[in-house]
Amino acid sequence: SQDTFSDRLTIFLTHFAFFLKVYKTEENKKILQEIYDFNFRQMELSIREIGYGDQSINKKMKDYINVFHAILSDIHFWDTMNNEDKINKLSKFFNNYEKIDHLIEYFNDFNNILSKKTLNSFLKSVSNS
């Protein structure tokens, strides 16, 4: 199947959803909001670079934000879901993905890696100070 901007964005949004799921605490609220805002600003710039006009950009951004929040909602209980539930959840966003079980395994690993690190371990290398 064809690799598209939309597919790549869905992959990114899924990673970002896991990132927010793992690190969302009251203590991290402000910095995570800044990261969220930054990511969606960058997405909008990328969509503009592809050549979408202002009206279609607003619709595209709304669509992508809705997809992101749907992913975030669907993975909320990832840690307690069985494999079949995980497949059902991710299949909604990756319906053309042939090896969904590999994707589930990958995101299980990604989730575990994130949960073993602190948010600060990711922020050290990107801070402005």
Predicted ranges, named:
Residues S1-S129:
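Surface/interface-facing alpha-helical segments and adjacent flexible terminal/loop regions used
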